[in-house]
Amino acid sequence: MEHIQGAWKTLSNGFGFKESVFEGSSCMSPTIVHQFGYQRRASDDGKLSDTSKTSSTMRVYLPNKQRTVVNVRSGMSLHDCLMKSLKVRGLQPECCAVFRLIQDPKGKLRLDWNTDAMSLVGAELQVDFLDHVPLTTHNFVRKTFLKLAFCDICQKFLLNAFRCQTCGYKFHEHCSTKVPTMCVDWSNIRQLLLFPNPNNIEGGSHTLPSLTMRRIGESVRIPVSSQQRYSTPHPFSFSTPSPVSECSLSQRQRSTSTPNVHMVSTTMAVDSRVIEDALRSHSESGSPNNLSPTGWSNAKAPAPTHREKAASSTGQEKNKIRARGQRDSSYYWEIIASEVMLSSRIGSGSFGTVYKGKWHGDVAVKILKVTDPTPEQLQAFRNEVAVLRKTRHVNILLFMGYMTKDNLAIVTQWCEGSSLYYHLHVLDTKFQMFQLIDIARQTAQGMDYLHAKNIIHRDMKSNNIFLHEGLTVKIGDFGLATVKTRWSGSQQVEQLTGSILWMAPEVIRMQDNNPFSFQSDVYSYGIVLYELMTGELPYSHIRDRDQIIFLVGRGGVVPDLSKLYKNCPKAMKRLVADSIKKLRDERPLFPQILSSIELLQHSLPKINRSALEPSLHRAAHTEDISSCALTSTRLPVF
């Protein structure tokens, strides 16, 4: 029991435990780990003089090849005298043993921490680690992090830094003073907590006291960058620790009483899941887990067969834990409905109603016309949101999130400008030809981007094209096939969607299971070009909606191209005619459309700046010269 207490208090110093987990007496294990002890030199023998006896001091050799001299006062125990020296080095007296060095015969005698310190004035003491403490030394290497990584000390970006090959601790060079002294052997800790060995028990059975999750939550502190590093067991090597001088960043060996600044221990991260799993297994078993000091030492050196088995299954365990810990990335794009404040209703369309709202600024909220969505619809909606959230383009409205509570809704950026439909058919804005061509180019550029992402708009029209901050085109209401289709049971059934004036003939006929395609978006874009180049809507002479559906679906009517502006370029007229062809396969795709409009823009005549200087400047220059000539003094001629 004492060994378990000492080990837990050791870990509490490194992991930031605010309160002691165990309460009891000090460790009294007869076993000692000699590899951590201070190696005395021959020159150190006989250095203790009579002055040290008269000054009431003791010389103490500490782990990690350090030493110090402590003052002794009357009434102080050995524990009280050495507490400060051990604390500044990140050590706990409960996990160490103290010995008195004997000169003749040469050896050492184990002392109790409660021994009166006055009886040891002038003596030489040695402090060693107990054998059940699962610690090892770091194995630092310099590493260039090509992938995104952060310092475990300051949480800042890493590029050229250091990393421990054993525990994975990574840090900047200027953060090395805060690196924990000892490397935590996580495989031993996990084996101790989860796989105790009840067969090797000496001196009776010892049980692990129960811990509440409240105390664990209060004591464990997990930095963000360390949550993944210790989330899976690591197959550490169990070789003898190398000397500290080889892994302390090339710092010279300290021989004075001042502690090595590169070895000062600080709060180290620990994954709470390790302790939670141990508590869960402890509570489910119904009987206490038996632990002993021998169990600690056995966990430190497992059998070769066990190590080979653990190494072979490490990949499978890592994949299982990672799969369990991952969360759907679309979860972070879902917005809580109570955080969005709706202000005014902007309008309604074929698939929903648009409101202006407030969510960290002005946003547009489109509440979709889907009542009581089924689990299949919700999953399909989330799948499409996962595609929409990856769209980033200057001519595309920025997708900001979605909502599923009460109603399905999407949140996009707010566009201050009006729609192209409002400019052309309500405000009757008079655009110049080069402005109309530029609007057509930006629209084609945005649609080309969507098609490159395999997103079909399905509702391309002038109402969904917005002029933002001047003449910057923003395309909205794209994608969302889930809400633009009719559901029959758990299957999607295509239905007549969109405004009929911009619908392609094959979409109106609905003869195919999925009539929507890149070419159907091209047809809708062709109608938008017709609006730009005429300032009118197509089929204005037909008043009956059903008649338009019948005639367009059968191919009996096409937009009247004779109404195009007289100054419309011939290339633009051909592009409008090609985009609204009856046969789907005869229409061009947006890469071809975009290149055609860009060539047209370059061929348009431009007003070049005159190379002549302004006459005002020349007149002023001439006036200055003439004034100088008039004011010049003429010398008399003799």
From Swiss-Prot:
GO biological process terms held by the UniProt record: MAPK cascade
UniProt: ATP binding residues: 346-354, 366
A UniProt-annotated Pfam family: PK_Tyr_Ser-Thr
Positions annotated to bind Zn(2+) 2: 151, 154, 172, 175
Reaction it catalyzes: L-seryl-[protein] + ATP = O-phospho-L-seryl-[protein] + ADP + H(+); L-threonyl-[protein] + ATP = O-phospho-L-threonyl-[protein] + ADP + H(+)
GO function terms (MF aspect): ATP binding; MAP kinase kinase kinase activity; protein serine kinase activity; zinc ion binding
Name of the protein: RAF proto-oncogene serine/threonine-protein kinase
